[in-house]
């Protein structure tokens, strides 16, 4: 087995190996530099030296409040509030979670940049997973692609859903008339969403959703596809009579810790606006 093959088993991506080669890192066997083509022998000690984390020059530190659920030297788990972007955009160039993370790192003396493993739309609330260095990011990104980063969402949709539980297996791609909107299309990427109803009345349904894939706007598109757009989601057919944003919350997250191999589980309670909506206090 070569160093390259073994590194892959450790979760070191090809991209990260390239960064190690050209970014100031090193691969050593028994204290001597080797290339990725080196064939490992019994008793070899492999040392991987990762390049020093480069702090982004374009991402500014801003004192954005962060609700930190967990933090160690490898990962950061955050409960994002609604109306806060994950990263800066042209429409919202500042005040993002990423800006707040940079500020948090500077305040706590951590030399790192932002490695988001999971992102949320600006109006979606709930749990986000962040890696604090490239190795953790590489492992967690691979785990996510293999369905090992589990996310469960809570949503409120318009109308009473007839089916108490089910699976939407419908490919998602860009809408031909929009750079933002997505749609179910035969030539889109595979997208699978599992759902089950938690409570309902004639006007709306509270539903729990588990993602098998992670396409942009996946839950919003799939619920609209079923004829039950999210309350507040005007992009996909919802109205804002009851709530001022799409009623979507990342409620549960579980993953295997990239370094300790511990089973990590987190829960974020519903924000006040969604809790009131479910209780019928918003209308």
UniProtKB/Swiss-Prot annotation:
Enzyme class: isomerase
EC nos: 5.4.99.-
Active site: residue positions: 121
Gene Ontology molecular-function annotations: catalytic activity, acting on RNA; pseudouridine synthase activity; RNA binding
InterPro entries: PsdUridine_synth_cat_dom_sf (IPR020103), PsdUridine_synth_RluA-like_CS (IPR006224), PsdUridine_synth_RluC/D (IPR006225), PsdUridine_synth_RsuA/RluA (IPR006145), RluA_PseudoU_synthase (IPR050188)
Protein's UniProt keywords contain Isomerase: yes
Transmembrane feature ranges: none
Database matches in SUPFAM superfamilies: Pseudouridine synthase
Keyword Isomerase: yes
Catalytically driven reaction(s): a uridine in RNA = a pseudouridine in RNA
Gene Ontology process terms (BP): enzyme-directed rRNA pseudouridine synthesis
Xref: Pfam families: PseudoU_synth_2
Keywords for the protein's UniProt record, in alphabetical order: Isomerase
Family statement: Belongs to the pseudouridine synthase RluA family.
NCBIfam families xrefs: rluA_subfam (TIGR00005)
The protein's name: Uncharacterized RNA pseudouridine synthase YjbO
Lineage: Bacteria, Bacillati, Bacillota, Bacilli, Bacillales
């Amino acid at each position: 087995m070569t160093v390259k093959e073994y590194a892959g088993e450790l979760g070191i991506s090809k991209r990260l190996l390239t960064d190690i080669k050209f970014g100031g890192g090193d691969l050593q066997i028994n204290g001597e530099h080797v290339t990725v083509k080196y064939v490992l022998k019994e008793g070899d000690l492999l040392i991987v030296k990762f390049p020093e984390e480069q702090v982004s020059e374009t991402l500014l530190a801003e004192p954005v409040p962060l609700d930190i659920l967990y933090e160690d030297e490898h990962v950061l788990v955050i409960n994002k509030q609604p109306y806060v972007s994950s990263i800066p955009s042209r429409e919202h160039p500042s005040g993002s979670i990423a800006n707040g993370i940079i500020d948090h790192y500077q305040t706590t003396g951590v030399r790192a940049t932002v490695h988001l493993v999971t992102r949320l739309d600006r109006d979606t609330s709930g749990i986000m997973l962040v890696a604090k260095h490239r190795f953790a990011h590489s492992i967690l990104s691979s785990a996510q692609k293999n369905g090992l980063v589990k996310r469960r969402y809570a949503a409120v949709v318009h109308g009473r859903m007839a089916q108490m539980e089910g699976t939407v297996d419908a490919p998602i791609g860009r809408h031909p008339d929009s750079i933002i909107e997505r749609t179910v299309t035969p030539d889109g990427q595979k997208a699978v969403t599992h759902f089950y109803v938690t409570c309902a009345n004639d006007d709306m349904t509270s539903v729990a959703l588990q993602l098998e894939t992670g396409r942009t706007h996946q839950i919003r598109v799939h619920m609209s596809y079923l004829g039950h757009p999210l309350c507040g989601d005007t992009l996909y057919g919802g109205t804002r009579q009851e709530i001022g944003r799409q009623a979507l919350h990342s409620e549960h997250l579980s993953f295997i810790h990239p370094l300790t191999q511990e089973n990590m589980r987190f829960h974020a309670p519903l924000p006040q606006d969604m809790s009131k909506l479910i209780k019928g206090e918003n209308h």
